[in-house]
A protein has these predicted regions:
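RNase H-like polynucleotidyl transferase catalytic core
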Residues: 180-186, 223-234
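Short, surface-exposed amphipathic charged segments that create phosphate/polyanion-binding patches used
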Residues: 195-199, 236-250
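TOPRIM metal-binding catalytic domain and adjacent DNA-binding surface shared by DnaG-type primases
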Residues: 18-115, 123, 257-275
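Phosphate-handling DNA/RNA-contact segment within nucleic-acid enzymes
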Residues: 97-198, 212-213
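Single conserved hydrophobic/aromatic residue that forms the stacking wall/gate
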Residues: 1-8, 12-14
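Acidic beta-strand-to-loop metal/phosphate-binding motif
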Residues: 167, 197-208, 212, 227-230
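A residue-level signal for conserved active-site and pocket-lining positions in enzyme catalytic cores
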Residues: 76, 124, 201, 238
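Short, aromatic/basic amphipathic alpha-helical patches
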Residues: 210-221
Length: 275
């Protein structure tokens, strides 16, 4: 009877947390899962280069392969990430172990799970991967490059440079806009692949962030298109806009209505900035 009572109390507590705070519920589930998760299998030793795709992702399960109740899948569902990308995102319960497998002795702090976002080049070859924290671990994003000569650009394997190209800051934001890549927090050099007026930059909505404002001015100076968020925008980024209930079509309409270039972009940016 005591065991049944404890199980009943746990169910009530789970339901309460889920009802009051869905985000906290996802983090709470993840914490419970971590305690009961089996240890990561020992890596197989062979003589092939450590950079090969299979040694990095082969031991990981994609989000698509996880049970619907798995905390990592619940997190992705909660962020409203389109299901077409579930097989392109992975769960890693020991991120530090994964990093040290390809770059020994890089990660020495306390290990924890992360969402793995792989970066592929235009030929489909893996050249980097990003770990996104589920909880409050810092930094929130950690990107590991396997090829130091390549820029940290996400989404190159599916972008069409003959069409209008959108560029966001974060990889997750790029999943909600067609033909979109992410600069992953770095200044992107497009190497003349595409006319400047065929490129639209979308930064996070942070008018008080000096670094972002500086980069926005740089985009305008290079004659790229720039999205300048309206004054009544209360969401921080594209993912927040989608989570609020906005559809992809409505998002595209919002972006198009707030896209500027040259003098009009400069005028709007001067009004937008709060620094």
């Amino acid at each position: 009877h005591g065991l049944l009572r404890r199980q009943r109390q746990m169910c009530i507590r789970d339901s309460f947390i889920k009802y009051v705070d869905p985000k906290m519920y996802s983090e709470y589930l993840l914490e419970r899962y971590k305690k009961s998760a089996p240890a990561t299998p020992r890596p197989k030793f062979d003589f092939k280069p450590a950079f090969e795709d299979r040694t990095i992702l082969d031991d990981l399960k994609s989000i698509k392969q996880l049970d619907d109740e798995h905390p990592a899948k619940q997190y992705v569902i909660g962020r409203k990430i389109p299901s077409e990308f579930y097989d392109k995102l992975f769960f890693c319960d020991k991120f530090g172990q994964l990093v040290n497998k390809v770059k020994p002795n890089t990660y020495k702090t306390k290990d924890h799970p992360r969402l793995i976002i792989p970066f592929y080049d235009t030929t489909g070859k893996l050249f980097a991967f990003q770990g996104r924290a589920f909880g409050n671990e810092q930094p929130k994003y950690l990107t590991i490059k396997l090829d130091e000569n390549k820029q940290k650009v996400y989404g190159l394997e599916r972008v069409n440079f003959q069409r209008q190209v959108y560029i966001t800051e974060g990889p997750i934001d790029s999943l909600f806009v067609d033909n979109c890549i992410a600069a992953a927090g770095a200044d992107l050099v497009l190497k003349n692949k595409i006319p400047n007026d065929q490129v639209t930059y979308i930064f996070d909505n942070e008018p008080r962030n000096r670094e972002i404002i500086k980069r926005m001015y740089s985009v305008v100076e290079k004659d790229y298109n720039l999205v300048v968020w309206p004054d009544d925008m209360r969401h921080k980024d594209i993912n927040d806009i989608i989570i609020s209930g906005t559809s992809k079509a409505e998002l595209l309409d919002l972006l198009n209505k707030n896209t500027y270039s040259k003098l009009s972009a400069l005028t709007k940016l001067n009004e937008y900035k709060k620094v």
